[in-house]
Every structure is written in C-alpha cells, then in structure tokens.
C-alpha cells in the first residue's frame, strides 16, 4: 500500500493507483474529460490538474502514479486558475449549441464549465468549424463540438476491437474521424455515445426527441440476447424513447449491445393490439371474451396428449410457468422452450449454463471456441474476451467458423476429427490444453443446432473430463445461448420432447420460428405482441404485452435470474401474459392457484431454488454426458448471422433495417 496526503488527510491506496484515483478515494471531486476508468489513460484534456508539493507546476492527476509521501492539494488558487485556463481553451472553439444539442442537461462540459469555468469569455476571433463525419445509422456526429478527449478512439480500439476511429492533423487542427467514413463495423458502437463527454456523438434515432428531465426511468433487462445486460428504459407517457445501459460489474459493466440499445422502435410497428379469430380463412377482429371462449372450447374438444405449448425467445419465466401449470392441469405434458430443436443436455443445470460466468472470463488463460460466434451472439461478453486477448493474458483458439471476432485467434480447422483428437490427446493443440490452468470451452449453436449435436457434445464432455475443467476452483465448460428465454425455460422443465406432426392444438407463446408447414392441420393459438409468422398462421390471436409493458423474470446464460420491470402500458387492448393465461384458465374452469404476479413468483421460489436468489448465481452441479448418436461428416461451422434482426421486435425496427442496409453497403465497398 502507498501512503500519501490529500488536502491534509492521510490515505492509503494500492500500488499502481493514480493520483486521480487517490483523490477520488479521499472523497475529492476532480473534474475530467479524457479519463475513463475502463479505458487506457490518455492525459490530454488537462482538466484534472492538481497541485503536488515540490512540483514546479500542476500535474495531470489521471496520468501520475502515486508514490509514498506525496502531498496533493486539489483546491488551491493555483489549481483553480489552472482549471479555469483549461476550460477557457476548451470553450474557444466550442459552439453555443446547448439549446439544440441532444446532450443538453446531461453534458459533462456544461456541468464543469458552470462549476470550474471563469464565467466570462475573452475570445473574440472566429471559431473553427469541422465537417460532420458519417459513422452509420446509429451515431449522429457534430464534430465542431468535439474537445479531442479521444474516448471514442480508445473505446473503439481497446473495448470494441475495431481500429476504425482515429485522429488526424495536429494542434488546433486535430480532427477525430472514421477515416473512410463508413458504417462502424461493431455490434457495440453505441457505447461511444455514452462515453462522449460532450455533444459530438449522439444517438441518431433519438435526435431531437426528448430532454432528460421529461423522461421516466425504469430498470430492466435486455432481452435480445441471452447475456442479461442491465438496461434503463427511458419513456415518456406510453412511448419508449430510448434505452441506455445500467452498470452491472458482473455482467455488462456499463456497456450495451447495439441491438439491445436501438431496436426499441420495433415496439411501434406491426403490433397486435386486439384479439383476432380466423373465420372462413380470414382473421377478423373479436372481443376478448369471444376469443378466450373459442380457445377454451377448442381445448376442451382435443385430447390432452394432442396439445402442445411452445415458448418463443422473448417469453418470461412467469408466463412459461403459468402456461406449464395450466397444461399439466389439463393433463398434457407437452411444452417446450426449445423452438429450434437445440441438442442440449439438461441432466444437471451446469450442463447447459455458461459456468465460467461473464466476469469469470477475467481469470481464464485459454479459451477454446467450438462452433461459437460470440461476437454476434453475445457482443458484450465477446468484448471481455477481446480485452483480455489484447492485454496478452488470454489466448483464444477455435474449431469452426472463419469470421472476425475482433481479436487474435488461432484457427484449428472445422473437421469434427479435431474434437476427437483433442479428446484422446493426439492433436498438437493438446499441449496448450494441458498447460492451461484455467481453460474455458465455449460451445455455440454451431454444435447444438446440428442433428448430430448430442454426439459432438459427448466428445466435448470427454475433453472437459480429461482436462478437469469443472472443478471446485474453476468452472470451464460453457454453453453460449442466443435467446433470452431458453435458460429460464430449461430451469422450470419447460422442455419436453415433442413431435409437431402428431399434434392437434398448438399454443404458441410468442413463437415465430418453428416449421409451420408441419402444423397445417393443427389448430394454432398465438399469444404474442407482433404480427409475424406465428400470428399469420394462427386460428386465434391473443394480443400480449411486450417485455417493456410487463414485469418478468429472465435467466441469463450464466444462470442468473433478473427482473425486467414494466415501463409502459400495453398497446390497444393487449394484456400481460399471465393475465391472459389466468383468464383462459377461468374459461376452462381450472384453478391454477396463482392470481397475480407476486403469487407466481412465490410459487416459483418454492419449487425452484434458483428463483429464490434473484440477481445471484447459485451453485450448480455438472455431470458427464455421453451419447451413442453417430457423427456426421459435415464440418463444424459458426456462420455469421443477420445480427440486427433475430426476433420479432428487432425485425420490425426501422433502425435495425437501416443497420442491415448500411452493413451490406459497407461489405460491398470492402469487397
């Protein structure tokens, strides 16, 4: 520990800390623009100047390491004058855009100019202006406002792993640019908006829409992937205006994927706002009572074993649990969250989780990707891997896939024989596996979405056992899930094998990705919020609330249950999922024993211990899996997906459609 004096107070800080961190620990507020705790130090704004005894001039506290016996002053006339001077220089070329700037009200420059500036301006020359740069459909630029803090540049290279932003020229002519002015090739580019301390980088979809003080903030969870990123929904009235990240050090830190951040406009389009019944081949509007009575009458006329419920990728745990309870009361055990027929082993909870945990990536020294594409499936998780690789503390190899993961990676090939050789120890990469103390294996849908997924999974389990990576001090086996609902569904047993061709009635809970050609003679009930494939095929449509319009539990890929709170009201006469299921149970004269959300959650906590520990990860068991299925000769792949459109909300988002167009245009230019 290092001892130093800050404004007369003796403090101790860890070795390697900066003076800025020491001052912050001492409770002192140090103004800054370029410094960010998650980025490399630049030291170029000079706003964090403090006085150090025996130093002839103020020092940049963010870049100065602490040493024993330092005496620091943060509020002397010298410091005050230095900060006023720096602020005056920063404002020389900064435009008076505050009334029309989207950063107004949440701008670091505004706040610090008010607190640390002189209050008067001595500059009477012409201000410089800079042409705005094009960075794609998500980021709106106003580069005349840029103060050259270089946060965006460092984020792009250090966190996102893309070397596409930099500075050109020198002195007062310096400009931050994307060089070729193309769409940024990153799935987490929107975070540059958050870290920009001024209004140089703003959200293009949110431009001129609202001011901070007009918005209601609601804590929620991102549902467009399985990471469980913590988000804040900002709404005005019953409209979602924007989505921002919430800090959670164990999951997303303070970052957010572009799909979770920008796809909210999809909540406005193609919404199901009233019930429909198919009559004479056409869907016609109906009342709730008529729709529910039709559903109840049809259910009563079908044998229980011919009824199935399938949950979609955005379904909450509570909705699946109530629907499962209803089907069990009817005498049916046909229900599944596995609409894509993934080959997942569910003998133990640790067999289908990301056991290392997202934060645990910091400890790994070797990562083996098998049929996994974390860049598109879990962008924020992938950025953690990338940061470790760029710090030379993690090596990554992969089997299957030739896509760019934004970091250095060793390609082992795509032949299934590679996994067999690793399992028996004859492959040359075996040496690296043996040398690794904390080996992490990530299995993606390039494995479990295959017909021979169980056979490959069995081989991977042999590797897990051979190298003992599921032990008390380290959990190295990981399944990379790609949907928000799947872990929660598996946790409650909403996962029985089903054969669609043998069914007479299908209850689809927001399901749009099943092969509907197998359900041509099946009566389909669709409970969901968007008019997509499920609604188009339905005989009865029950309009439900989206994730922003109801409270629900989602379990992320590492097995952590979290609550997404209700931010706005459902559209039209749509109802919350559990309310629809409860009313349907009433028409069926069935008592499911749960009348409200609180009762559902109490029952969940009693029956499944994971739901008694919201926001926490419980200890999970793991057991070796073996299969006698035959391996195919097809190579393992992890093909790039249409990242921006993976569910009904993102598919109906105008912003996401623009992203797809921009990416296609960029790819054509590069080609």
From Swiss-Prot:
It holds the Pfam family NADH-G_4Fe-4S_3. [4Fe-4S] cluster 2 binds at residues 146, 149, 152, 196. The keyword Metal-binding applies. Residues 1-78 form the 2Fe-2S ferredoxin-type domain. Residues 78-117 form the 4Fe-4S His(Cys)3-ligated-type domain. Binds 1 [2Fe-2S] cluster per subunit. Binds 2 [4Fe-4S] clusters per subunit. SMART domains: NADH-G_4Fe-4S_3. One of its GO terms (molecular function) is 4 iron, 4 sulfur cluster binding. Keywords: 2Fe-2S, 4Fe-4S, Iron, Iron-sulfur, Metal-binding, NAD, Quinone, Translocase. [4Fe-4S] cluster 1 binds at residues 94, 98, 101, 107. Its EC number is 7.1.1.-. One of its GO terms (biological process) is ATP synthesis coupled electron transport. Residues 215-271 form the 4Fe-4S Mo/W bis-MGD-type domain. Transmembrane segments: none annotated. Belongs to the complex I 75 kDa subunit family. NDH-1 shuttles electrons from NADH, via FMN and iron-sulfur (Fe-S) centers, to quinones in the respiratory chain. Couples the redox reaction to proton translocation (for every two electrons transferred, four hydrogen ions are translocated across the cytoplasmic membrane), and thus conserves the redox energy in a proton gradient. This is NADH-quinone oxidoreductase subunit G.
